[in-house]
Amino acid sequence: RVVSDNSGKACGTCPACECGDFMLCEHKTGLGLDNNYKVFGGSGGFTKYAKIPGGILRLHPHAIWEIPEGVKYEEASVLDPIANAYKAVAQQSSLIPGQDVVVFGTGPLGLFSVQIARIMGAVNIVMVGLQEDVEARFPIAREVGATHCVNASTEDVVKRCLEICGRDNLGLVIECSGANIALKQSLEMLR
């Protein structure tokens, strides 16, 4: 029983790979995407079994982790979004306690980012989602630490987030939705 860190197929020669950050490889082919179906032998990100290229272990010996006995698959499956949220919010951002945070995307990565921002001392934590998130995901976001939820389907996201946070106290914007419009809005609200 193992789990991959989803380094996928990294080149090993670009600047990111040379620094050991294989997730940022310029030529990386990720696991479970339609455009690389054949690269991984038809394995997707949510299949029970996936073929991981052995070459990644020569580059990154810790690309595959053994799941300890007693840890269920369901528990192990959340390690990826938790680790990614932790790396983004706690290790790579310059968030200072007392600043505000905006998180785009109400999936596991976004929800874990909210939790970590709360632990790190963020004051206003704004979760941005869509109409379908109002009943299902927004209550969870509030439960794990979001102070405000903004419905991008009905509200001017940039205006509303800046009303809540103010441009000067907005310390971090995290984009977890994958939507182009969210990336554009993220950049608009930054100093």
Task: Set out the residue ranges of the language-model regions.
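NAD(P)H dinucleotide-binding glycine-rich loop of Rossmann-like/cofactor-binding domains
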Residues: C11-F104
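N-terminal Rossmann-like NAD(P) cofactor-binding module of classical short-chain dehydrogenase/reductase
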Residues: V3, G171-I174
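Helix-to-beta-strand junctions that scaffold the AdoMet/dcAdoMet cofactor pocket
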Residues: L190-R191
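Conserved amphipathic alpha-helix within the SDR
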Residues: V157-R167
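Hydrophobic beta-strand signal
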Residues: V2-S4, V102
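Beta-loop-alpha module in the N-terminal Rossmann-like domain of NAD(P)-dependent dehydrogenases
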Residues: C176-Q185
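Mid-domain Rossmann-like dinucleotide-binding core that forms the NAD(H)/NADP(H) cofactor-binding site
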Residues: K48, E69-E155, K159, L172
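Glycine-rich, N-terminal phosphate-binding loop of Rossmann-like dinucleotide-binding domains
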Residues: N6, S153, S177
